Amino acid sequence: MRGKVEPGSFGDFAESVMVSPVETVKPTDRLVYAMKKLVKKNIGCVVVVERKKPVGIITERDISRKVAKSTKVLMTQVKRVMSGPLVTVTPSTPIAKVLYLMLKHGIRRLPVIEKEELVGLVSERDLVRWVLQISYEPQIPVEIKQILAKRSEAKT
């Protein structure tokens, strides 16, 4: 189920844009299992969890890079391919900080954790949707404008 995204003040937090629940795999699962989940659920990533704690992430890009080298990699355990350590946020992390962390680390998705357990995921797509929904507001704070401008510059 998608997180409820409501336009409002820029005091919004990660929990207002995150997706929950999040598709997960275990470190010992085979890469082919993670790939099948991505295709079946039409999603761009799965979070790797161990005892409910997020320890890594597998994206479409991770899989395509590995499979391009050899299809034998599909039987490899997820832990050998996953990206980590993770940069994470909490449900109460301000959206401005979420944007900043994505830009700083060059990542597109941030797991949302509470008491070390995975509770959601914020993606660039979720943030774009949020920005579009609040775009009717007459003034976007300078902080958000600067972060979005830097993100746009980084892509060109």
Please provide the spans of the model-predicted regions:
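Tandem CBS (Cystathionine beta-synthase) repeat/Bateman regulatory domains
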Residues: M1-T156
